[in-house]
């Protein structure tokens, strides 16, 4: 190969290596609202959020200068995942480099979630963000923007920084803090800055850019397979209610149990027996009414409650001896172990399989814990009457676990659900829940002991290798924190509005999941139950709507099995990036040609000079 050609090739390679990475890289920025702790309390602060996206493998990197008061790493990872899910993009082909800079230490954590998600969507979709706007709020499953603290201080800081508009979570215009109430609309008018509400990530992106990123679904396309299975499950449980009711109807509790109650120190009158019977009857009626409305999960829940009451009555009527009670406990323990072994052997392939496995195993775990309580009561008091309800609960929980197992093996998209992937999802969810808990404790300290305990239970399941239960338990812990956040500082009269708004978001999220071919059986079940509770128990409705959100988006932690690898040029890189890449390539080629031209020119000039000198020497 001639030397000039060789040099040309080397030069082209070097130029390509230098230019191509810059062509791939994309950078973005937005202002970040935060609070900082001072001697006089919390004050608003402004930080800068930067994001650079480069070809990679889906990794997330975060740098903060200076360090933030709360850990922001998991919020960043979760916000990235929600952003990718919102635009239905597989982000495993790029790495995300986030940087947060501020003049002094700030409290970021979960409250930065909405900003991170908005910036991520804008970068991936190649949308220009309005730099004079900012947003504050957590980002939750389904793209819900959740409440945060310090809103008054953040709005004031935004005005001071010259921003024109601030987006806050919906329902947060009235702020209660330090025994005072602030209307942010009135505050914003006085300051000369606009404040707007945003419920979801799609609303926020539209507010920043005018562009819609998510389709709105009017109704949920309920999976017929789900309907048929849940209807059958509810029918089985409600048929059992009628069977147990018939068995309990003819028992004489006064003779068999209540007559001896005074000597036992419990159930000293027949009114408590009647209360059990009345409650069972009321739950049976509710179960039947829900079934007629085709609210099958709610029907199953009510009938399960009735079954526990009826079974308790039957056990009380039997007046079991200690030996008989121990025998029943041993029998149930064996049945739980056998059923769990069957469950472990099942090869989970779909999100429905995963959720059915979670639902069944949760019930088996609760049954086992209930049996342990029954044995503890029996050993402490030596009286079988006190363990009747816990024994009945264990028996009925085992029965409902069997019912939920009927969802296993249904059709659906196959996902990679191996142990390593499940373990990672569990660890991520624990970190998300713990980070969210730390954030809430900044504003309402020493109030989340029960949630701390739940996160601890998730950690225990992680240690035991029960990754599915770990994922579910941690998801519910996070939902518990989000529920507290959603009502923190809000007047009780607004709870109903919050519930309605949240349920509408849940409905849209489930509809979207169903449209993707992933019907979330747990998410929809909790959504249905929350709807049934919103008039009678609004706080429980809020809690179950949070459960529906968390357990309705489990697919963001998993990848579809056997999904073909997409080519970077044709699918993974957006059109603008492709144009940039092509332009960089042409630039490199042209630069190489010009460089090669001058090299060649110099080379041949030198060659001619050398020949001329050689001829002169020869003549001499």
Name every feature range the model reports, one short phrase each.
Residues 588-605:
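Alpha-helical transmembrane segments
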Residues 570-587:
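Juxtamembrane/start-of-transmembrane alpha-helix segments at the extracytoplasmic/lumenal side
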Residues 9-18:
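Bacterial N-terminal signal peptides
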Residues 465-573:
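Membrane-proximal extracellular "stem/stalk" segments
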Residues 604-620:
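Cytoplasmic C-terminal tails of single-pass
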Residues 312-315, 319, 323-399, 403-424, ...:
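Long, low-complexity or tandemly repetitive, helically biased scaffold regions used
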Residues 24-281, 285, 317, 326, ...:
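Peripheral, non-AAA+ core regions of ATP-driven protein-machinery
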Residues 288-317, 378-409, 459-486, 537-557:
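Charged, amphipathic alpha-helical scaffolding segments
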